[in-house]
């Protein structure tokens, strides 16, 4: 996502290297590069023109800041204007003073509207808001069944009257059912079409008039580029929407939709879909996306993902096990699964500042390594996972694990060596000391005469089973120790 745009923008900063300050002459080339980058990302031409004009005015009017080079100053100006372009701040979902809150979902066929409805329902559940989904798409085969299946997956009820009922009547009765059940929010999944047609728009307008939604959200496909912005504008003019949900933002998209929707339609992006899983829906934060576009990472979203995936009680238990040197392979596999719940490895790494330069090949290699590790740990017995030292001292156990996991004995030995080193390092960091120099750590595996130093103990090369006896100091001739 946005990789090509980020790389092109980086070329723009390079144009200002070695300059003392921003001037009309030296900024010209950088602005041309930014312009080319945005157009290549399929940002609307009028949006690009306005953006470049605003950046130029701010850059030429900026005061010289001591200790900040022109390139850094220019990046900050571009960042501020990107945030401004996309809407400055997150616009939350509406919430009616008196329940139920009614959210009308609209969009063309193939944009992921029905899935987005379920994703939004799950998001509301996580916010402790009860939801009811209403299936009014009576035209597309299996649309009602799809919503019911998704509802079962996320444990959210679905209201429908079958495929022969009138969509407007289904929507009306769905809202009444929500009132009867005391549900907080109603999500009405309307029919999509392959194109905008008068019949669809008239039906949507009638549903809107009857249910009087608090939010009318248009689901658009990010991969359609600036066309998504034009579609949002058309829907807003004819129906009156309050925001958009941008789907497939994790795909091979150039970013034009995210940068054009607010400016062209005047309506905010409220959520973005970042994957196929039903959990893969995030509130849209313009500042965070601007950071990612400029290769600054997105630490806040990463922290939020971690908070969702990881239980605080589990973290405390894990911390205690690290400090007590009882961290084992069961804990290690649990950590790996926590990470999987947070999303793909590539997606997580790109949220970390400075990790954007990792190639897709590097990420793929890392994902394969994680799978190999999980396969080897899965081939261990319960006793071996609880006591990794058993494997270090037993070649026969390592051979059995290698055969069971489909990997070599060398791979298993390497896993155990790296695990032992990692466990020691984690304990040292947890206790606030430095590797190899912590009081009372001599008996820890791998410590020896420094971090993983000393001669290998029983088992295999590279592993040290215990601290061993301290080496005797040789007497020096002459003055000895002064």
Curated annotation (Swiss-Prot):
GTP binds at residues 107-114, 189-193, 247-250. One of its GO terms (biological process) is SRP-dependent cotranslational protein targeting to membrane. One of its GO terms (molecular function) is GTP binding. Residues 469-482 have a biased composition (Basic residues). Its main location: cytoplasm. Its EC number is 3.6.5.4. Pfam families: SRP54 (PF00448), SRP54_N (PF02881), SRP_SPB (PF02978). It catalyses: GTP + H2O = GDP + phosphate + H(+). Involved in targeting and insertion of nascent membrane proteins into the cytoplasmic membrane. Binds to the hydrophobic signal sequence of the ribosome-nascent chain (RNC) as it emerges from the ribosomes. The SRP-RNC complex is then targeted to the cytoplasmic membrane where it interacts with the SRP receptor FtsY. Belongs to the GTP-binding SRP family. SRP54 subfamily. This is Signal recognition particle protein.
């Amino acid at each position: 996502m946005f990789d090509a745009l980020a790389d092109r923008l980086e070329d723009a900063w390079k144009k200002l290297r070695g300059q003392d300050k921003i001037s009309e002459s030296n900024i010209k080339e950088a602005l041309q590069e930014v312009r080319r980058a945005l157009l290549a990302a399929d940002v609307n031409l009028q949006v690009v023109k306005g953006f470049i004009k605003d950046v130029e005015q701010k850059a030429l009017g900026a005061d010289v800041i001591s200790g900040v080079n022109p390139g850094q100053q220019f990046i900050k100006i571009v960042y501020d204007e990107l945030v401004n372009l996309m809407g400055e701040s997150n616009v939350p979902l509406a919430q009616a003073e008196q329940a139920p809150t009614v959210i009308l979902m609209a969009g063309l066929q193939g944009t992921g509207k029905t899935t987005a409805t379920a994703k939004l329902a799950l998001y509301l559940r996580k916010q402790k808001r009860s939801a009811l989904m209403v299936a009014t798409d009576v035209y597309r085969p299996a649309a009602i069944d799809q919503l019911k299946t998704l509802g079962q997956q996320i444990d959210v009820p679905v209201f429908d009257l079958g495929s022969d009922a009138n969509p407007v009547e289904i929507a009306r009765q769905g809202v009444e059912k929500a009132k009867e059940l005391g549900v907080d929010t109603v999500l009405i999944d309307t029919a999509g079409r392959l194109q905008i047609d008068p019949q669809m728009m008239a039906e949507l307008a009638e549903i809107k008039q009857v249910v009087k939604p608090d939010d009318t959200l248009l689901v658009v496909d990010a991969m359609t580029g600036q066309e998504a912005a034009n579609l949002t504008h058309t829907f807003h003019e004819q129906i009156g929407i309050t925001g958009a949900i941008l789907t497939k933002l994790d795909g091979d998209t150039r970013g034009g939709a995210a940068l054009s929707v607010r400016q062209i339609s005047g309506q905010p992006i409220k959520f973005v879909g970042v994957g196929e899983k039903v959990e893969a829906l995030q509130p849209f934060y313009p500042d965070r996306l601007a950071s990612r576009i400029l290769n600054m990472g997105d630490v806040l979203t990463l922290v939020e993902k971690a908070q969702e995936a990881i239980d605080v009680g589990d973290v405390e238990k894990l911390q205690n096990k690290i400090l007590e040197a009882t961290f084992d392979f069961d804990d290690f596999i649990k950590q790996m699964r926590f990470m999987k719940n947070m999303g793909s490895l590539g997606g997580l790494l790109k949220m970390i500042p400075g990790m954007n330069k990792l190639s897709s090949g590097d990420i793929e290699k890392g994902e394969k390594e994680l799978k190999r590790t999980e396969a080897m740990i899965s081939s261990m017995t319960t006793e071996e996972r609880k006591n990794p030292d058993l494997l270090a001292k037993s070649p026969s156990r390592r051979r059995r694990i290698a055969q069971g996991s489909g990997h070599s004995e060398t791979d298993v030995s390497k896993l155990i060596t790296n695990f032992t080193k990692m466990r020691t390092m984690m304990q040292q960091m947890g206790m606030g000391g430095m590797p190899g120099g912590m009081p009372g750590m001599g008996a820890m595996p791998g410590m020896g005469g420094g971090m993983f130093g000393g001669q290998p103990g029983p088992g295999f090369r590279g592993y040290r089973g215990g601290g061993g006896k301290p080496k005797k100091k040789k007497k020096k001739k002459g003055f000895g120790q002064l």
